[in-house]
Amino acid sequence: MNALFIIIFMIVVGAIIGGVTNVIAIRMLFHPFKPYYIFKFRVPFTPGLIPKRREEIATKIGQVIEEHLLTETLINEKLKSEQSQQAIESMIQQQLQKLTKDQLSIKQITSQIDIDLEQVLQTNGNQYIASQLNNYYTKHQNQTIASLLPNQLVTFLDQHVDNATDLLCDRARNYLSSAKGTQDINDMLDTFFNEKGKLIGMLQMFMTKESIADRIQQELIRLTSHPKARAIVTSLITNEYQTFKDKSLNKLLDTSQFNEIAENLSMYVTTYASKQANKPVVTLMPQFVDYLESQLSSKLANLIIEQLSIHLSTIMKKVDLRGLIEEQINTFDLDYIEKLIIEIANKELKLIMSLGFILGGIIGFFQGLVAIFV
């Protein structure tokens, strides 16, 4: 009976010692958080292992993640996977559908990225357009108009300048034949008669004002179709056209005139652009939106993946994944790290404590046997 008591006692004592030792060892991984001193001598095992090696642990974790987990090769493969392609394309499609559904305007789109488009157009647009026009004038002011116009346009004008005669004569004939033309001729005759006085009064003894106006009108209409009159008009137009082509830009417009035109043109362009920017994109450019939805989403997804893949090495160097993880771990409170590790390895830590009790009990059993027989 005595022997059994000794064995049981030794088992209990051994189990307590083994279990408590493991519990203390586990606690010493985390505690204390700071070193303790007695008369300038640091107490051994303070701080605990994890607080003491915290920076080394953070460095090693960052190294392992960068070199073995989130590697450039792995991320590149993931980027080029069909799943990533579909995810990016789906995201682009959602944004395009939102553009159509919400009737978003260009101004609303730019405001989402903190750009006041109207202010940009008013402050920078006017200045930029006027500056570009003035630079163009300074650079080309001594060149002829013909040299500044596109060759195709000059060729077209050269071939069709004679058509201006037909156009002018037709317009003149239509005007003279109209009620407005008749009225204007009568008004001019009244003015002429009033100015010439008695001489015209004598003429009216033979012809009425109406007959004179009618004769003048018919003669003017006839002149619009007369070959010689048309030849004169053609010659005048051709000469003026050639003179216009041969003029230099600064002869056609001096600096002040061009500056005024540039200012007015820039104001018109920016005002027009500002008005258009308030219209929904789907209304302003329906064909472009259709193209975006049908074709661009896939192309844009491929472009994004391709560019990310090309610049992935540079991006990862800039991000510095290892340094980022190390910095983040070092910002964690030690209480949080302890809680995190215990949550992750709770089952294993309990097994270690249980193993301490079991091993201590086994050692106590053998010690009891030794105590009985020795």
Curated annotation (Swiss-Prot):
Highest taxon above the source species: Bacteria
Membrane-crossing residue ranges in chain numbering: 4-24, 354-374
Topology term for the membrane: Multi-pass membrane protein
Protein name, entry field: UPF0754 membrane protein SAR1937
Keyword Magnesium: no
Keywords from the UniProt entry: Cell membrane, Membrane, Transmembrane, Transmembrane helix
Keyword Manganese: no
One Pfam entry name: DUF445
Entry's family note: Belongs to the UPF0754 family.
One cellular-component annotation, GO: plasma membrane
Localization, UniProt: Cell membrane
